[in-house]
Each structure stands twice: as structure tokens, then as C-alpha cells.
Amino acid sequence: MSDPAPTLAFGLDSVRQLLDARESALSPLAAREATSRGRQRPEAPQPLRLAFQIDRDRIIHTRAFRRLKHKTQVFVTPDSDHVVTRMTHTIEVQQVARTIARALNLNEDLTEAIALGHDLGHTPFGHAGEEELARLLPDGFRHNEQSLRIVDLLELDGAGLNLSFETRDGILRHSKGRASVTSDDGWGTPATLEGEIVKLSDSIAYLNHDIQDAIRAGLLDEAELPPLARRTLGEDHPARINHLVTDCVRSSLVTFEAGQPAIVLSASTLEATDELRDFMFERVYHHERTLEGAARGQRIVAALFGYYEAHPDAILGWSLAADPPSRRAADYVSGMTDHYALERARQLGLAD
């Protein structure tokens, strides 16, 4: 006679208890579901996922997230298949941020959710498209505000994702000022350390992958990077990433122990990183070839915005019918991929 089939050792209640136990083992400084400021619309807890994991999963399944794979980062309509897109940038930010969060015993789910959602609001043609919409829209346009607008209002046909406050805050406050990789851009410091991690990880990721893109494009050589950056951060891409992540963890732990927790870089690493950032603006972001592509992207964005503002009935979703035509046009155009924007401009006779 055969042995009876084994019974299931754990029920859903046990799964939830395990998740709660794992979260309770995080650093006292970590964000937790139990102390979250909640969602805009209350929801019952789920047995298999905690709040910030739900946020992360909802972001991954959005249309805006899928479109990131066809939005360029710096180089408009690049020739190489290896040039960074908003999608690959987002994944790199997620990887760097999760490594830091795990090392500091902070909430990885929240960190990932913020990282995956931080650039949902970016326009086609990189920052050039953002700058053009900022010029055209009466109230201005910022990609971080648009990212929040997407998760709050535009996804799910206007219902939004109903994300946790901490995820929404991190998405809004990830943007940085021009002065330094750690400066804010008018939105202040994120409410959580996890949000601070993503803000710094964004800089770590874009500076390093933009160097690789610029080298492939023939705009510079590794040996031309500032001596201080090469000496302090490392001679190549892996060394720089490793140094920046390790320095961040080490320096942040010092602030934890001092009772003034923050996500920071050491003074020497920050100086070298800011010098590298200034170098990239001078040699890459303001290079003639980069600016030529950006100008073309801006012309297309301006033409599409003008058309849809004048013809709001032609907007196929991705906007709120009650909004004024300018806002609807901005939502629609900013949601386009580079390819779709180019194709629509050609179809409408707007391409140059």
C-alpha cells in the first residue's frame, strides 16, 4: 500500500506571516508596510505580497513602462543597437539601487518600485522633448511630475495605479539639480531612505552608461575622462560602478551610526563624480552632434503638440477628456515613443 500524499505544510496565512517576519527584520530605518502612509484609496492587505511589492508589480505591467524600450536617453535615433534606452537605463538604476538597499538592510521592494517608476513620464527624444514641452505648456512640464501623473491618473484608463505614498513620493522627488549629482531640483529630499537611494542611483547609472554610449559614438575616449575621476572612481566602467556603490554604502553607514541617516557619497567621491558630470555636459550633452539630434526631436515634439492642441478629437486615449487641449496634447505627445512620434509626424505632414 502506497504512502498517503503529503499534506501542504504552509497555508496562505503562513506565507503572509513569513513576509511580515522578513520585513520586520529590516533596519529600523527602513520603510515598512506597517508604517506606510498608505494609498490614496484604501485597499485590503494581500496574502502573497506586501504593499511595496504590489506597487512594483503594478508599475511593471503598465503601458508606460513597456514604452520605455523605444524612448532614447541621450542620442536621438541612434545607429547602434547598444545605445541606452529609457528601459535599459531604468533597469540599471534598479540594479544599482537594489544592491545599495540590500547592503543597508533597507526595503528592496520599495526601492525597486521607485526605480522602475521614476522615468515613466519621460518624453520621446530624451530631455530635449521634455524641454520643448516645458516651453510650450502654460504650466511647464517636468518628467518627474509626469511620471506621478501617469501612475496617479493616466494608467488604467484614468483610474491610476493607487500606489503607496512612499512610492509616489520617491518617483516625484528623484529629480536632481544641475549643481551636483546629489542636489535636488526644487522638490526636496525624498521622504524615505529608499527614495534617496534611487535618486543617487539614477546619477550613478546615467553618468556611467552615457560614457559608454559616447565612446561608441566616437565623441570621446576613456583616456580623455578627467584625471580626478579616473584616479578616484576607476579606469573603466565596472570599476566606477563598484567604487560608487561601495562608497555610497560605506558613507551612508557612517551617517546611520551618527544618528543622522542619509544616502551620501564621501567628499572625495562626490567631488570626482561632479567633475565627471561637468565633463559630460561639456563634451557629450552639449556636443554639436547631440544638439543636432535634440533640435530635430524638439521640432517634431513642437509640431505634434501644436497639431493635437488644435485637434484634440484626434487624440487616441492617454489623456483626460476634461482637461484643456494643451494638457491633453502634452500627455499624448509625451507618452509617444521616438518611433511613433516620427511616424505620426510623417503621416501628418509635420516631419522636416
Give residue ranges: language-model regions:
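Conserved short loop/turn motifs at secondary-structure junctions
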Residues: L116-G117, A134-R135, A321
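Histidine-centered, transition-metal-coordinating active-site segments
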Residues: M1-R86, T90, Q95-I100, N107-E108, ...
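A glycine- and small-aliphatic-rich helix-loop capping segment at beta-alpha/alpha-beta transitions
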Residues: G126-P138
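Short alpha-helical catalytic segment bearing the HExxH-like zincin motif
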Residues: T111-L116, K199
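Short, internal active-site loops enriched in acidic
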Residues: D119-L120, G177
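Short active-site segment of divalent metal-dependent hydrolases/proteases
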Residues: G121-F125, A205
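Alpha-helix boundary/capping segments in eukaryotic regulatory proteins
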Residues: A103-L104, G121
